[in-house]
Amino acid sequence: MIRIKKISAPETYAIRKTVLRKNIPLPFQFLGDLDEDTFHLGAFKNNELIAVSSFMKMHNANFSGEQYQLRGMATLNQYQGCGAGKLMIEKAFTLLNELKINYLWCNARIAAVNFYAKVGLNTFGDKFEIEFVGEHYLMFKKIVNQ
């Protein structure tokens, strides 16, 4: 059974570093990690942290109203496909709804676009490149009507 709970920013770093920043010269600590409005979720299986995600209050000019950005979603390789990511996103939707947030958005790696689409996010605009990481799409979900 997988449990989702809030965790601290430093608890996300090992998995971010292993999954998202392996052989990439970019920081695994994000601007905004420690902001008061930011929250981080962890997925635990048998009390082991197997996946992480971070949600930061961040404005994107393509959307209006209150917004959060999803960053640093990562699942340890041996646990990918077990449902941890979906459970974290569903928990985030609940929390963001309680906060009356209008939009959740993210810069999704090409490899993750299908996953995000399955959990209810839509692509917006053309694909774009992030140096050292690769091609991405802006994706979003409307959480609460304005």
Give short role names for the model-derived ranges:
Residues 42, 48-58, 69-74:
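Conserved beta-strand in the GNAT
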Residues 16, 116, 121:
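Conserved active-site tyrosine of GNAT-family acetyltransferases
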Residues 16-46, 50:
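Active-site rim helix/loop that mediates acceptor-substrate recognition in acyltransferases
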Residues 1-12:
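A short beta-loop-alpha structural element at the N-terminal edge
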Residues 89, 96-109:
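Conserved GNAT acetyl-CoA-binding A-motif
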Residues 58-70, 80, 132-135:
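A conserved beta-turn-beta hairpin within the catalytic core of GNAT-like acetyltransferases
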Residues 79, 83-91:
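Conserved acetyl-CoA pyrophosphate-binding loop and the N-cap/start of the following alpha-helix
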Residues 107, 122-138:
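Conserved catalytic-core motifs of GNAT/GCN5-like acyltransferases
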